[in-house]
Structure formats: C-alpha cells, structure tokens
C-alpha cells in the first residue's frame, strides 16, 4: 500500500523496555505466521538483548527489525553504548533516534540526535528521527517552533542524508496517556514538517505518526495525506492489535 506521492506506508513497533524470551517468541511467531508485511512495510524495534532472537525469528520474512537507540560514536571507550556497526551486524534496518523518552529522561539534545542519525546512516541503517512537543508547549502555541528547532540540526545533514531517513511525529502529550491527536491535528503538524523540508526532497521523506496509535484510530490517521504510517508503542506488543494497525 502506498500513500501520497507514492511513499510506501510503514508501520514500526517500538517495544520499549518490555518483553522476555518466551513472550517475544510467541509474538514474533504470530507476526510471521500472519505474513503481516503483505499489508504494508513493517518492522519492530526491540531492546538490545533481544536483537539476536528477533533476527532469528524474522530472518527471511518481509518484516524488518531494528533497535531503539544508537551511539553517536562508531567505537571507543563509551561504556554502555551500542554502536551502529554493531546493530548492522545483527541485520538491523531501523534504529530510533530522539524518542521523547530519550530526550526527556536522558537529556538528549537536538544536536546529539542528529549525530546519532548520521552515525546510523554511515553504518547503512535507516534512522527514524522522532520529534514532538509537550502538552505545555502545545497549549502555549509553540508546537511548530519546537519541531522546527528539533529538526534544524537534522536538516543540516543535507538532502542526501534526509532521503535515507524516516521522521516520526510523536506528540509527547499523547504517548502512553491514551490521548491521541485527532487526524486533523496530526495532519497539521505533518504538513508543517513537510514544509520545513521544502527543497530537501520533502515529497520523498516518510513521516510517521507516533502518539497512541491503535487499531481503532489507525485508518483515520493513515488517511491523512502527509501521514505515511505509524510508530506504534504499547499496541505493538499485542500481535492482533499490531496486525490490525498494519492492515488499516
């Protein structure tokens, strides 16, 4: 299935810090058995310890896999960090960078997020660069200003880099809260992101929505012209719900 400008729809699951070997095995088996990727391009971003399990379970399928973070450095004395070339060795295609939980809980700066995106690209991975505003910023009328600020160092990487990325709009106030931006609210921001990319192959860059996407609201969100799929949190941990989103 394709979206506006023939951008292929993409649905990515972000497992966050959930799962165990037994639960993962059951979930991955259900996804593979359903041939979920027939509906659209799909992937799951899993905790680092489960990359080998995920790769083994999905190898040869149409479903990709990836990680939830990456170091800005290729190697070195960076205890606890995981480098992009390491992720590539596990067959990762995707890696999330700049998720709101990383920005908030680990004080990741806009520049660090861009540096991580660059490191991912250099290793042949596709970074999924997350941007979004808090409830306070939205209510203060600062949504677009915040997102433009977050995007600035990413756009500075240039057009050739940008067309190899995916962007994800995740309104912080809608993550894990049960609240969801209306399709019209989400489209407004996605359209503004597309405007910010003007001159940088804006029509080629996929922009996902990532704020409490569920089977019940996926179709209305994905019907918007500038929403190219979803970055799915909790719903990606339930095979039936994740597949419903993919089929929306």
UniProtKB/Swiss-Prot annotation:
The keyword Isomerase applies. It is found in: Cytoplasm. Its main location: cytoplasm. Its EC number is 5.3.1.1. One of its GO terms (cellular component) is cytosol. CDD domains: TIM. Keywords: Cytoplasm, Gluconeogenesis, Glycolysis, Isomerase. It catalyses: D-glyceraldehyde 3-phosphate = dihydroxyacetone phosphate. Transmembrane segments: none annotated. GO terms for biological process: gluconeogenesis; glyceraldehyde-3-phosphate biosynthetic process; glycerol catabolic process; glycolytic process. Pathway: Carbohydrate biosynthesis; gluconeogenesis; Carbohydrate degradation; glycolysis; D-glyceraldehyde 3-phosphate from glycerone phosphate: step 1/1. GO terms for molecular function: triose-phosphate isomerase activity. The active site is at 99 (electrophile), 170 (proton acceptor). Substrate binds at residues 14-16, 176, 212, 233-234. Homodimer. Belongs to the triosephosphate isomerase family. Involved in the gluconeogenesis. Catalyzes stereospecifically the conversion of dihydroxyacetone phosphate (DHAP) to D-glyceraldehyde-3-phosphate (G3P). This is Triosephosphate isomerase. It comes from Bordetella pertussis (strain Tohama I / ATCC BAA-589 / NCTC 13251). The lineage of its organism: Bacteria, Pseudomonadati, Pseudomonadota, Betaproteobacteria, Burkholderiales.
